[in-house]
Amino acid sequence: MGRGRIEIKRIENTTSRQVTFCKRRNGLLKKAYELSVLCDAEVALIVFSSRGRLYEYSNNNNVKATIDRYKKAHACGSTSGAPLIEVNAQQYYQQESAKLRHQIQMLQNTNKHLVGDNVSNLSLKELKQLESRLEKGISKIRARKNELLASEINYMAKREIELQNDNMDLRTKIAEEEQQLQQVTVARSAAMELQAAAAAQQQQQNPFAVAAAQLDMKCFFPLNLFEAAAQVQAVAAQRQQIIPTELNLGYHHHLAIPGAAAADAPPPHF
């Protein structure tokens, strides 16, 4: 069911009238506040109860200034509309400028108080409020600092685990490479041993071929005995030949075998 219409007339019951006054007064103050905030309007509300108690509201916390503005506007309203608008605009901007200057001054004082300046003129209550604000600020700062430190510690722990894993991988690779190098070294040693065993076996089977190969490596004698025999035969053939120059001179030169001593050759005859 919908709410029934209430007849607008004086409430005879004193208690009911007082309760209704409180409710309607609070609603009126709320509406005045909403009007000033939503519409950026200057609102002043003055209420007297049946017992003569004063209730007032002003969005700039100065009902008297609003009343003075009203008086000036009412005084200028009889002349023309344009001057009234100009006066109202000028008063509005002056009030707004004063508000802004006051807010700036308050903020500057607050900033100075936060760093410990100009606290000599503060009362005990204001000092307690300032102390409470500073403690709350320090608590928030410490909480944020601890949060950042915890995050940094977690990151460093993860980084440590990653570095340990990388170190393990590197050690594994180094061990594998050392094992491969050891295998190659063992294989080379085995191959050299096999070559030495094969050379020893070949020397036992054919010692003259091995000796000839060793002499050839040192460049002392020809490669094999067949070449040596051929050189001896060539020297013998030269001995059997007579050089014409030696015959004309009346002597013949004894050809020396390569490698023979110089003392074995006969002296020449003149």
Swiss-Prot record:
One of its GO terms (molecular function) is RNA polymerase II cis-regulatory region sequence-specific DNA binding. It holds the Pfam family K-box. Its main location: nucleus. Keywords: DNA-binding, Nucleus, Transcription, Transcription regulation. GO terms for biological process: indeterminate inflorescence morphogenesis; plant ovule development; positive regulation of transcription by RNA polymerase II; regulation of transcription by RNA polymerase II; specification of ovule identity. The keyword Transcription applies. Residues 1-61 form the MADS-box domain. SMART domains: MADS. It is found in: Nucleus. SUPFAM superfamilies: SRF-like (SSF55455). The keyword Transcription regulation applies. Residues 90-180 form the K-box domain. One of its GO terms (cellular component) is nucleus. InterPro entries: MADS-box/MEF2_TF, MEF2-like_N, TF_Kbox, TF_MADSbox, TF_MADSbox_sf. Probable transcription factor. May interact with MADS6, MADS7 and MADS8. This is MADS-box transcription factor 13.
